[in-house]
């Protein structure tokens, strides 16, 4: 058992201002309580939303900020009331580390929609301390907000699944799109998009990758196993694909028109938005008279557990580039340029942090 109310320090890499440049930062972890796990971080993925946060693109950033919400680690200590985990377990945690536990979303295992949820970084915990993310040596997380990483799934492979994997898996299940034989589109072939191809194919779907240019065609068809490739600027190709898809996953994290992709949907088809965009959506209303624009935000811890088991059963892994922490600023610059196939993962435990 762990010692209750024990405060420790750790070193992470933090942004100090909207330049988004990260550098070593030593800080106090929040007190570890009876329901908490004290975790050594092994690996942490880099998500495009980390860039939005460290650069204050959403106008809500507080500094110093240690980013990282695709975290896999090893349990070093457990609180006296922890029942599901023990020292030595390999666990994952994501972007939500607190909720009210009493609202409708919390009571229906959808805690990520709780209005009082606490983000794993760039937020304030119940004790008044700022939350900090997984680009750090250690973290403290409540038992409710971690999941066991299945044996046989490497830590660096599991990390992106904590965000990118469940972001795709959750809406397919939630919106009744899990059955085989469906035809789906994946708009954008990045960290989330490439997992979209893999998970949809594993569910038995016919998958079309939609991209702004032809340069990812070989990757999509030969390496990821997509069935078709569509260039959004190809008017003839887009016209031929009209009314052909049951759903389109829109993973693009910047402002873009929606009408071209609504036109690809069958009647009652769904355009599922997962990219973080800091601007109002614009579309012509007749385009959605018999289709739907909807969205999805990561997944609950229960859905994350289901997704990990699904990936284990199907042998799915993310395609990653593993880096050390001293390369993280270069990696963030490359990510902004879409120069990664398909997710950076920081080898935190193998990095010099101070």
Curated annotation (Swiss-Prot):
Pathway: Aromatic compound metabolism; phenylpropanoid biosynthesis
Pfam families named in the record: ADH_N, ADH_zinc_N
Alphabetized UniProt keyword annotations: Lignin biosynthesis, Metal-binding, NADP, Oxidoreductase, Zinc
Keyword Oxidoreductase recorded: yes
Binding sites annotated in the UniProt record for Zn(2+) 2: 100, 103, 106, 114
Cofactor: record remark: Binds 2 Zn(2+) ions per subunit.
Documented EC number(s): 1.1.1.195
One GO MF term attached to the UniProt entry: zinc ion binding
Cofactor(s) for this UniProt protein: Zn(2+)
Residues noted as binding NADP(+) in the record, renumbered to the chain: 49, 167, 188-193, 211-216, 251, 275, 296-298
Record GO biological process: lignin biosynthetic process
Annotated binding of Zn(2+) 1, by residue: 47, 69-70, 163
InterPro entries reported for this sequence: ADH-like_C, ADH-like_N, ADH_Zn_CS, CAD-like, GroES-like_sf, NAD(P)-bd_dom_sf, PKS_ER
Record PROSITE patterns: ADH_ZINC
PANTHER family tied to this protein: ALDEHYDE REDUCTASE
Family: Belongs to the zinc-containing alcohol dehydrogenase family.
The protein's assembly and partners: Homodimer.
Protein name: Probable cinnamyl alcohol dehydrogenase 1
Organism of provenance: Eucalyptus gunnii (Cider gum)
